[in-house]
């Protein structure tokens, strides 16, 4: 028989930098989970990732206080900022442009994010990436 799920917890943790300090420690501790067990498992799985890349993680919490976690791909804004070589998006998207990305970069980001997006084709994923780029104040060229 399957374990009874008592809840889910969504966090965004830097790759290889999970530690018991806030915000991870209190979020897991409130639910009675072993904080160090999560930190060690997460850091082991994110060793191959670039340091401090934000990794969204969904933790499934079971009634016996055990857990499993599923890692997602980094946020689209992270990839777009890297592609445009900027620190942050525009404060006034649509008026001020913070940078630009090419359609080749958009395709590359769409292919990386494909498994987390709710779309069937790369072209529809590219349209989602282009929309995110515009909302950040980035110009899409090409």
Curated annotation (Swiss-Prot):
<keyword id="KW-0687">Ribonucleoprotein</keyword>
<keyword id="KW-0689">Ribosomal protein</keyword>
<dbReference type="GO" id="GO:0003735">
    <property type="term" value="F:structural constituent of ribosome"/>
</dbReference>
<dbReference type="GO" id="GO:0070180">
    <property type="term" value="F:large ribosomal subunit rRNA binding"/>
</dbReference>
<comment type="similarity">
    <text>Belongs to the universal ribosomal protein uL11 family.</text>
</comment>
<dbReference type="InterPro" id="IPR006519">
    <property type="entry name" value="Ribosomal_uL11_bac-typ"/>
</dbReference>
<dbReference type="Pfam" id="PF00298">
    <property type="entry name" value="Ribosomal_L11"/>
</dbReference>
<dbReference type="InterPro" id="IPR000911">
    <property type="entry name" value="Ribosomal_uL11"/>
</dbReference>
<dbReference type="InterPro" id="IPR020783">
    <property type="entry name" value="Ribosomal_uL11_C"/>
</dbReference>
<comment type="function">
    <text>Forms part of the ribosomal stalk which helps the ribosome interact with GTP-bound translation factors.</text>
</comment>
<keyword id="KW-0694">RNA-binding</keyword>
<dbReference type="InterPro" id="IPR020785">
    <property type="entry name" value="Ribosomal_uL11_CS"/>
</dbReference>
<dbReference type="GO" id="GO:0022625">
    <property type="term" value="C:cytosolic large ribosomal subunit"/>
</dbReference>
<protein>
    <recommendedName>
        <fullName>Large ribosomal subunit protein uL11</fullName>
    </recommendedName>
</protein>
<dbReference type="GO" id="GO:0006412">
    <property type="term" value="P:translation"/>
</dbReference>
<comment type="subunit">
    <text>Part of the ribosomal stalk of the 50S ribosomal subunit. Interacts with L10 and the large rRNA to form the base of the stalk. L10 forms an elongated spine to which L12 dimers bind in a sequential fashion forming a multimeric L10(L12)X complex.</text>
</comment>
<dbReference type="InterPro" id="IPR036796">
    <property type="entry name" value="Ribosomal_uL11_N_sf"/>
</dbReference>
<keyword id="KW-0488">Methylation</keyword>
<dbReference type="Pfam" id="PF03946">
    <property type="entry name" value="Ribosomal_L11_N"/>
</dbReference>
<dbReference type="InterPro" id="IPR020784">
    <property type="entry name" value="Ribosomal_uL11_N"/>
</dbReference>
<keyword id="KW-0699">rRNA-binding</keyword>
<dbReference type="InterPro" id="IPR036769">
    <property type="entry name" value="Ribosomal_uL11_C_sf"/>
</dbReference>
């Amino acid at each position: 028989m399957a374990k009874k799920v008592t809840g889910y917890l969504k966090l965004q943790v830097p790759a290889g930098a999970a530690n018991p300090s806030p915000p991870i420690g209190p979020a897991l501790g409130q639910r009675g989970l072993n904080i160090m067990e999560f930190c060690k498992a997460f850091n082991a799985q994110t060793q191959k990732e670039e340091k401090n890349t934000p990794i969204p993680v969904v933790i499934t919490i079971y009634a016996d206080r055990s857990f499993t976690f599923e890692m997602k791909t980094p946020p689209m804004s992270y990839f777009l900022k890297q592609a445009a070589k900027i620190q942050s998006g525009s404060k006034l998207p649509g008026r001020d442009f913070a940078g630009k990305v090419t359609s080749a970069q958009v395709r590359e980001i769409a292919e990386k994010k494909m498994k987390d997006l709710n779309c069937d084709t790369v072209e529809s994923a590219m349209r989602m990436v282009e929309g995110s780029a515009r909302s950040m104040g980035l110009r899409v060229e090409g």
